[in-house]
C-alpha cells in the first residue's frame, strides 16, 4: 500500500498545526491538499500525455512542474492515471506534498502563476 491509498494515513500531516486538521483546505466535505509535481519524461508523446493529465488537475508553473490542489480520492486517481502513462524504466514523476503552513511561507520570484484553486462542481 502506498501513502495516498492508506486509509489510516493522516492527510498532509503538519506537526505545527495546533488545530490538528493539518492545514488541509476544506472544499465541501473533502479536505484538499496541494502538491508540487515534477517530471522527467524521455518520450515526447508520453511527456505530452503526462502534461495534459496534470493540466486537468492543476496549473503548470514551469515546463515540467505542476501544482495541484486535490482531495485524497482525486490524488489516488491522478497517481494511477500518471502511472499508466509512463515507462517506469526511463521516466520519472516526483510528487511533493505541500502543507498549508509551508504553502503560506512560499516565495515566488519573477513571473508567477496563480495558485490553483478548484471550486466544487455542482451538476444539476
UniProtKB/Swiss-Prot annotation:
Highest taxon listed in the record's lineage: Bacteria
A single BP term in Gene Ontology: maintenance of CRISPR repeat elements
UniProt EC number: 3.1.-.-
Pfam families in UniProt: CRISPR_Cas2
Molecular function GO terms recorded: metal ion binding; RNA endonuclease activity
Record-annotated disulphide pairs: none
Residues where Mg(2+) binds: 40
UniProt cross-references to InterPro entries, sorted A to Z: CRISPR_associated_Cas2, Virulence_VapD/CRISPR_Cas2
Required cofactor(s): Mg(2+)
The keyword Hydrolase is assigned to this record: yes
Keywords, comma-separated and alphabetical: Antiviral defense, Endonuclease, Hydrolase, Magnesium, Metal-binding, Nuclease
Family to which the UniProt record says this protein belongs: Belongs to the CRISPR-associated endoribonuclease Cas2 protein family.
Chain's role: CRISPR (clustered regularly interspaced short palindromic repeat), is an adaptive immune system that provides protection against mobile genetic elements (viruses, transposable elements and conjugative plasmids). CRISPR clusters contain sequences complementary to antecedent mobile elements and target invading nucleic acids. CRISPR clusters are transcribed and processed into CRISPR RNA (crRNA). Functions as a ssRNA-specific endoribonuclease. Involved in the integration of spacer DNA into the CRISPR cassette.
Oligomer status and interactors: Homodimer, forms a heterotetramer with a Cas1 homodimer.
Protein name in the entry: CRISPR-associated endoribonuclease Cas2 4
Lineage: Bacteria, Pseudomonadati, Pseudomonadota, Alphaproteobacteria, Rhodospirillales
Protein's gene: cas2-4
